[in-house]
């Protein structure tokens, strides 16, 4: 299961390295398990598929605003931008860790709306 703070640190570093530093191969080598189960219906399983996804969006960036950990799960809440001028997509990602590696991923994505029915910010 590992230390919760260490698990949180690892997941944040994994996303920083992959999406903000644009080094998906290094991120996979350091943080991803050899078996990587993907629950997003638009993304295939496996480390190679993750690398291909990141490379398909060379301007992509992730701004993680919250990180929560419990047991072998880490949850992030943040903003994904696929291009520099993208308005952004709010993302909630769940990661399952095993033996210090990310082995499973779920996500829920919501485009950042131009208008809101209430005065509350997304974060």
What are these regions (language model features)?
Residues 1-123:
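C-terminal and inter-domain tail/linker signature
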């Amino acid at each position: 299961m590992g230390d919760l703070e260490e698990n949180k640190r690892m997941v944040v570093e994994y996303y920083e390295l992959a999406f903000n530093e644009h080094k998906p191969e290094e991120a996979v080598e350091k943080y991803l398990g050899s078996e990587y189960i993907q629950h997003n219906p638009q993304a295939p399983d496996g480390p190679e598929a993750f690398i291909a996804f990141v490379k398909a969006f060379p301007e992509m960036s992730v701004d993680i605003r919250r990180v929560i950990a419990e047991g072998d799960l880490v949850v992030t809440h943040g903003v994904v931008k696929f291009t520099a001028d993208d308005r952004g997509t709010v993302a909630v990602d769940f990661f399952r860790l095993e033996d210090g590696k990310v082995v499973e991923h779920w996500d829920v994505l919501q485009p950042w709306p131009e208008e809101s029915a209430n005065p509350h910010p997304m974060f």
